[in-house]
């Protein structure tokens, strides 16, 4: 096997191929990247039985072949090569990588033992890449990081005729985003896919500037897969098995008690006042006709408070919220103002979830395509 490729193109391809590989694996062979020659250049692939990545690039191929090499090591080498064409060749069980005056010799891995890369050829729909990446970032923050309950470590994709919904929860909060969807299926049936949040987050970052992203869901050999394709790059992922909780029903249809606040001011005030708090403590937010007051009591008698402008509609309200959870929602709103709506429970002494949505101005509500529901901490009275 022998080829020559552009250094930047080759480095980016290797980096993409290994990005989703686990840091540690019980099977060393799964840490490799598979390089194969094609009629038009090269195909680079990786697979750990759960996630695969595959990309194609142009190259001048002198001798066809396929080889398996340590992925992360090759990625580090490719990123540090001098600005010159990459010359790649195999000599028995060794791989030689040259660029300019830099030379590297690596051992190849047993390519015949490498598993087959999954191929997804089902019907696909299209989403705008930038909007999809934004939606993934907005919703992904609410996904659980506790592997004890795998079903909530994912983001639920809900496919409709013209929209794609993304939903995530960690039991303490729920995030929902709707985006436009060009449904490529002939059946028109609604579909759902529960994708690991970590994988989906990396996919969003990778394909964020790709124009459009093709998404297809398929069932092969009793394995449910989802595939994302753009710019000659494809990522597949096994879906999480289990029933995602029906969290959409938690969102109220209408709320008459809410406050409108400048988003940046609320973020900065929350960051300042929370400085005195212990790690898991909550901040007290008091909403009145005069505005919003933030209060915190920390250890060693440390205290902090701050008041900012807020336009309140409805009755005065006091809630306690974990600052980081609130900041995650505020950071995802992407509007100058934010609306914080206060829901009710059957117990008048127990505040209901707080709903965060965008607000175009103090007087005009924004798009409801993104919603973030946050469960308040019960106040100790």
Regions found by a protein language model. Give the residues of each.
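Structural preference for solvent-exposed beta-strand-turn elements
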Residues: 1-381
